[in-house]
Amino acid sequence: MYRVFASRALRAKSLCDKSSTSLASLTLSRLNHSIPFATVDAEELSGAHPAEVQSFVQGKWIGSSNHNTLLDPLNGEPFIKVAEVDESGTQPFVDSLSQCPKHGLHNPFKSPERYLLYGDISTKAAHMLALPKVADFFARLIQRVAPKSYQQAAGEVFVTRKFLENFCGDQVRFLARSFAIPGNHLGQQSHGYRWPYGPVTIVTPFNFPLEIPLLQLMGALYMGNKPLLKVDSKVSIVMEQMMRLLHYCGLPAEDVDFINSDGKTMNKILLEANPRMTLFTGSSRVAEKLALDLKGRIRLEDAGFDWKVLGPDVQEVDYVAWQCDQDAYACSGQKCSAQSMLFVHENWSKTPLVSKLKELAERRKLEDLTIGPVLTFTTEAMLEHMENLLQIPGSKLLFGGKELKNHSIPSIYGALEPTAVYVPIEEILKDNKTYELVTKEIFGPFQIVTEYKKDQLPLVLEALERMHAHLTAAVVSNDPIFLQEVIGNSVNGTTYAGLRGRTTGAPQNHWFGPAGDPRGAGIGTPEAIKLVWSCHREVIYDYGPVPQGWELPPST
């Protein structure tokens, strides 16, 4: 039944014509068959019409006798077979990475025409994603494997396209811009260059099946690296289709390998291939293990328990409530930037903010996927966490806290109403055990709400200081003194400040990444690409001439 609901939601919007949705959806369904690179039909993908996902290595698509059969997150039907490489099939991937030298596939001194090639590939790929039928294809495919509203899925495609547009033409070679400094004598100059790592690996999660892997993959390629890409198998069909689009747009077949495997197999490849750099986006637990396994040759964008502080100046309550709802519950809370804790100044507590949050949360429905399956926590696990929180003195359930009604979501996933639990700030900070419980990240539609009085800002800042992940944050205030105090005493790498502050969004036009950790990665901007996918190399030219009358000096 819910596959029907989802299909209706998928058809409900069109990127190109919101005024005639029925006609547009019918047309796009027919046009899917003319998408030149596609090997699946997102509209038909179901238990009755399953798909198979392949890996790609050394310029060829390959299958496997080892299949991971995925269940439809909406109804439990087996609907995708992922041909996963097992430990006996890793050697081609290890060999492929080993064929790339440390100095990369291109650098400022080697094959510089490839900078132009990738500007052209970006141009063509951006053009493809600007075609309504292609954009709709990816939005609907995202919805099938990581159920979210059409607007959220289409937004992911839009950000991906804008990123590609940002690196068209000469913009790729501009990433490799060098600088020169005059030397100590005639004929000497020092030049600083951005240098690739060579063989690299990329491991990305399920929640943004297109945006995260594509932006990191292209950043790695722009700087001259040869990447091996692994996307969570639950959603890897999206990036498999994107790989086919990139090949159609001129991506050299030997430049990228793409693998479907379990974590154990991928870990084996990492240890044997010894990549010069790995980008990992995902859980903190896996991130710390990989940091040890790879001896620090890693960049991380791991989990974030992200917070929002509402300042003393109350205004635009409806807007702030709406943004809080979006930050906490869009994509069913499955964003690494999702609002996990809301600090409410006592002035806001005098407004109908919480009641408005409850009303907004109750608007979310499974039928349009504004609330949907949670892919990494079961319903039981989330409810158990809620019950543990409610044992804290003074805590209470603000809204939610129940399993979704009338759903067919398989039990391996979660199905929870948007939920908020209030915990007094004094109790949060009472002891380490309570603090760890309250700040446990639940990757789902779940948030903690607390209140602070005007003289309790130091308690808020203490709570922020004790957090171990520092990805996104929001300080909702137009009071410059308050903003200065909170921003100056916090760390989060992507912090939104002001009345319209949010924790989510992650567009392509600004840095997105954690702070406070030398291993922290960024995504999307020239600065992020250069930081993650290149290192500094200094070349000192010293041509002479040797000074006239030079004589052999004494030993020193």
Curated annotation (Swiss-Prot):
* Induction statement: Induced by treatment with proline. Induced by drought stress.
Is-annotated flag, keyword NAD?
A: yes
Organism from which the protein derives: Arabidopsis thaliana
First-listed, main subcellular location of the protein, grouped into a coarse class? mitochondrion
Q: What is this protein called?
A: Delta-1-pyrroline-5-carboxylate dehydrogenase 12A1, mitochondrial
- For the protein in the UniProt heading, the enzyme class is oxidoreductase
> What's a single GO BP term from this record?
proline catabolic process to glutamate
InterPro entries per record: Ald_DH/histidinol_DH, Ald_DH_C, Ald_DH_CS_CYS, Ald_DH_N, Aldehyde_DH_dom, ALDH7A1-like
Site label Transition state stabilizer, positions: 207
Where is the catalytic site? 301 (proton acceptor), 336 (nucleophile)
Write down any Gene Ontology CC term: mitochondrial matrix
Known role: Plays a role in the inhibition of programmed cell death by converting the toxic proline catabolism intermediate (s)-1-pyrroline-5-carboxylate (P5C) to glutamate.
Q: Which reaction(s) does the protein catalyse, per the Swiss-Prot or TrEMBL entry?
A: (S)-1-pyrroline-5-carboxylate + NAD(+) + 2 H2O = L-glutamate + NADH + H(+)
Q: Which stretch is the leader sequence?
A: none
Name of the gene this protein is made from? ALDH12A1
Q: Which family does it belong to?
A: Belongs to the aldehyde dehydrogenase family.
Q: What is its EC number?
A: 1.2.1.88
Question: What pathway is it annotated to?
Answer: Amino-acid degradation; L-proline degradation into L-glutamate; L-glutamate from L-proline: step 2/2
List GO molecular-function terms, semicolon-separated: 1-pyrroline-5-carboxylate dehydrogenase activity; aldehyde dehydrogenase (NAD+) activity; cobalt ion binding; zinc ion binding
Q: Where in the cell is it found?
A: Mitochondrion matrix
Task: Report, as the record phrases it, the tissue specificity of this protein.
Answer: Highly expressed in flowers. Constitutively expressed at low levels in the other tissues. Highly expressed in pollen grains and tissues undergoing cell death. Expressed in old leaves, mature siliques and developing embryos.
The consequence of inactivating this gene is: No visible phenotype under normal growth conditions, but mutant plants are hypersensitive to treatment with proline. Hypersensitivity to heat stress.
Residues annotated as binding NAD(+) are 282-287
What keywords were assigned to this record? Mitochondrion, NAD, Oxidoreductase, Transit peptide
